[in-house]
Every structure is written in C-alpha cells, then in structure tokens.
Amino acid sequence: MPTVDDILEQVGHFHFFQKQTFFLLALISAAFTPIYVGIVFLGFTPDHRCRSPGVAELSQRCGWSPGEELNYTVPGLGAADGAFARQCMRYEVDWNQSSPGCVDPLASLAPNRSHLPLGPCQHGWVYDTPGSSIVTEFNLVCARSWMLDLFQSAVNIGFFIGSVGIGYLADRFGRKLCLLVTILINAAAGVLMAVSPNYTWMLIFRLIQGLVSKAGWLIGYILITEFVGLNYRRTVGILYQVAFTVGLLVLAGVAYALPRWRWLQLTVTLPYFCFLLYYWCIPESPRWLISQNKNAKAMRIMEHIAKKNGKSLPVSLQSLRAAEDVGEKLNPSFLDLVRTPQIRKHTCILMYNWFTSSVLYQGLIMHLGLAGGDIYLDFFYSALVEFPAAFLIIATIDRVGRRYPWAVSNMVAGAACLASVFVPDDLQGLRITVACLGRMGITMAYEMVCLVNAELYPTFIRNLGVLVCSSLCDVGGIVTPFLVYRLTAIWLQLPLVVFAVVGLVAGGLVLMLPETKGRTLPETIEEAENLQRPRKNREKVIYVHVRKADGPLT
C-alpha cells in the first residue's frame, strides 16, 4: 500500500493546499513573538528616581528646569558609581517642613551633600517615560527588580513544562485538537494578563501563556512539515521560523504605536481569537491519523488535499499505510542518550548548544532595552538581520555542510559580543553593525541546532533526543533574565563578556561533531556511532573484508 509521501507525489508536494496551510500556520509563528521576547517592551525600565513629597511643589515655586530639579534634589548625580544612589536612594529631608531656598536648597542643612543621610525610596518613583510598562506600574526596580527577572523566567518555565506535556498530548490526541486548545488558553490568559490588578495575577497568567504558547508553536511546526513532501520539509521549517522574524518587525512597530503595556498586551493577544477559525480551515495530520490506525479518515483528508490542489487520486492510491515497516519495536530510554561514547558526546554538545543559543538569543534582545539607545530602532534593525541568516542557511547547508556554518555562526556571535564591549557609545553606527552581526550569528546557530539535532540520533531515540536536548533551551531562557539584569547592575557590558565566552566555546564544540551532509538518517545505535567515521575509510574496510573472504578460493 502507498504511504502519504507516495500520494503527495501525485497530488503535489507544495501546491495550493500546502501554501494556504503554511500561510495560516505562519501567522501563529509570528504571533508567538510577543510572548517570547515581549519582555523588551513590556518590561522596559526607564531612568527613574525616588519620589519625594514636596519636591514638585518646590520646583514649581522656584521655577527650576528639570535639570536643576535633579541636581538639587537627587543624590549620586555625576558620580561614576552613582546609579544606585540616583535611582534607589533619597535624601532624608522633609521638603515640606525644612523651608529650603531656591538656590542650592540643601546648603542650609549641610555644607557638603555627602554628609546628608540617605534612605530608601518610601513614596514610589518618578519615571522618565511618556508610556508605561510593568516596571513602572508595579515598581519593579531597586529592591524589587528581581521580580522582573521572575516574570520572564516564569514564561520560560511554562515553555519547559508545556513543550513536554502538550507534546505528549499532541501525539496522543492529535495535532489539531491540541493546537486549538492551546490557542484558546493562550488567548484567554493573554487578555486576563492585560487586565491583571496586581503583579501576582499578572505572573500567573504569564506562566499559563508559557505553558501553551511554545507548545502551540511547535504543533504548528509539526503540522506544516507533515503536510508537505519530503523535499520541502527543511525549507518550510526554516520559513516557518522566518515568520517569527516577521513577528519581530511587527512587534517593534506595534510597541512604538502603543507605549502603554496593557494596550500592547491586549493588541498582540487578540489575533489568537481569530486563530480559532482554523477549526474549519486546517485538517488533522494524515500521518498522525495513520499512526492511530485511522486510515479511512486519513484517506479522506488526502482526497481533500488533492481536490484543493486541482489533482485527482489514481485508483491505485486509494489506501494508505504507515511509512515505517512493522517490526520489532525498541523502547527508548534516557540511558540510550549516554550509553555509548559517540552518542554521549553528541548529547552533551547538543545540550550545551541549545542552552547557549537560548542564552545568547534572548540575552542579546534583553540587553537592547538596557543599552541606552533607541529601543525601537535597535530592535527593528537587529530583527532585520534574521532574514539573511535564514537564507544563508538554505544556501549553505546542502553545499558547504552543517558543521562549519554552524561553528562559524557561533563564533561570529561570540566575537561580536566581545567586540561590542570595546565600541565607544558615540560610534552608534558601528555599535549597531556589530550588534547585528552577533544577532545574525546566533540566529543561524539557533536554526542549525534545530536541524542537526535530529540528524545525529538513531530512529528509535530521535524524538527523545530532540526533546531532552532542546529542553536545555528553556533552561537557558529561565537563567537568562537573572544573568542579564543582575550582571548589568555590576557593569553594563558584563553580560556581553559572558555571551562571548559561551558562544566561542559552543563554536569550538560544534567542530567535534560529525558532518551529516549527504548522509542518511541513522537507524541504529551502531550507525549513529559510526557517523564520525569518514565514508571513504568505511568503504576501504568493507573492501578489505571482501578480499579476505575471497582469499581461500583462489
């Protein structure tokens, strides 16, 4: 009996139905962007200072300019290490009772300001921004700044749990059902987050979004690759990630137009309600139906695909079977990922690369909000370079191979991070160029690890290997907010130094992996172990063995 791939040979690998389905699912990929990196705008931390009762009235009475008000009433101005004092401390002065003058009002209290006692902010903060973010609304600064780290870590914890749990449910109950359920929950949680009355509820709804959003993105990825023919799977997989990049560009524009975080959150959530219409637009995966022995339903869907593509099914292709032959089933085990030396090495290197790809990708985006430039333009420019990154991958993986482009992309990302440390702030053009190179490098590395991970494991542990290794991506996402925001409190460029080290190490480790270009996917542990061996040498061994076997006959 024919397989799905056999029927797609007749009805079209990537014709009208597949293009329509790809467009619809690509919208989900683009809509996932605000959840993954929306922290840049939702959690933007503007310059701030303690709110001191009486200062505003005194400033108005004396006719101070904004600069004079800061100079007279805020500690730490001009000091190299005065950021903490300027943003988190205040003079312990009762501005309403001390009757200060308008010229150097603190001079009557102490001849030297350094002798005046300082205390923590007690009446909130004043933020230098026309809009709002979760930071400004819930005062997530100074002693409460860790709560911003937790906000982003919560969504990554959700990614970690949801990808495993909902991934299992999608294999058990079907792609379409799980996709629609994740869309509905995501839409509801996003709206509830936009109207959250306090930080705790906002955190809970963000965690719920994390539980379902990445899983929904992955289900969309699986669906489109299962609807197209074999020769198009790699291309549509990369283009599905390009749709995520389009979402980055749209997010920058929407965030610029809507500087208030609640309206921004509501706006980027509303498209998910439209995605519920996919119930009538996208069928279940025929490959999944066959795996569940629902061949009749799978055949009806293939007939629907043929009709959409303007084709007709030959009489000889009126039944379906699974692509895999029925035989002895091997039960995968976590120990299989570390039992043999080569697979153990592959597992360790892949886990590290998933972790570093997540840390560098999310970390570079988060660092944009702290670098002091135009956050909207910097975000937009850095997103643009993801397009050439995707097309470079398509152009090189089947010509040059996987290993060298992957290693170089990691090293470029690491070197760009290190170079950024030494670029002066006044060279804005050079700073943006270096940042874009780093972003392009880590984008290529991210997409390459997705591709190569599946090519290094034998069939019976391939899904398990991808699942376990890619889980380190979410662990990296959990760690990254604390890494970025805590290290910048020590030195603004310190996260870039850390990114440079882990990126360069990742590039070196990739060179220890085998090249998988032109190789069939390994079916057994033995074949996976022999991937490191050059094919030419392997042919020589077979040749010698045959000569020895023929020897006694001559």
Curated annotation (Swiss-Prot):
The record's induction entry says:
May be down-regulated in diabetic patients.
Q: What is the effect of changing N71Q?
A: Higher affinity for TEA. Loss of plasma membrane localization. Loss of plasma membrane localization. Loss of plasma membrane localization
* Modifications the protein undergoes after translation, according to the UniProt entry: Tyrosine phosphorylated.
Keywords in UniProt for this one? Cell membrane, Glycoprotein, Ion transport, Membrane, Transmembrane, Transmembrane helix, Transport
Where is the site labelled Involved in recognition of organic cations and participates in structural changes that occur during translocation of organic cations? C450
The cross-references to CDD domains, in alphabetical order and at most eight, read: MFS_SLC22A1_2_3
Family to which this protein belongs: Belongs to the major facilitator (TC 2.A.1) superfamily. Organic cation transporter (TC 2.A.1.19) family.
State the protein's purpose. Answer: Electrogenic voltage-dependent transporter that mediates the transport of a variety of organic cations such as endogenous bioactive amines, cationic drugs and xenobiotics. Functions as a Na(+)-independent, bidirectional uniporter. Cation cellular uptake or release is driven by the electrochemical potential, i.e. membrane potential and concentration gradient. However, may also engage electroneutral cation exchange when saturating concentrations of cation substrates are reached.
Query: What is the protein's name according to its record?
Result: Solute carrier family 22 member 2
Q: What organism does the UniProt record list as the source?
A: Oryctolagus cuniculus (Rabbit)
**What does the organism's lineage look like at the top?**
Eukaryota, Metazoa, Chordata, Craniata, Vertebrata
Q: Which gene name belongs to this protein? A: SLC22A2
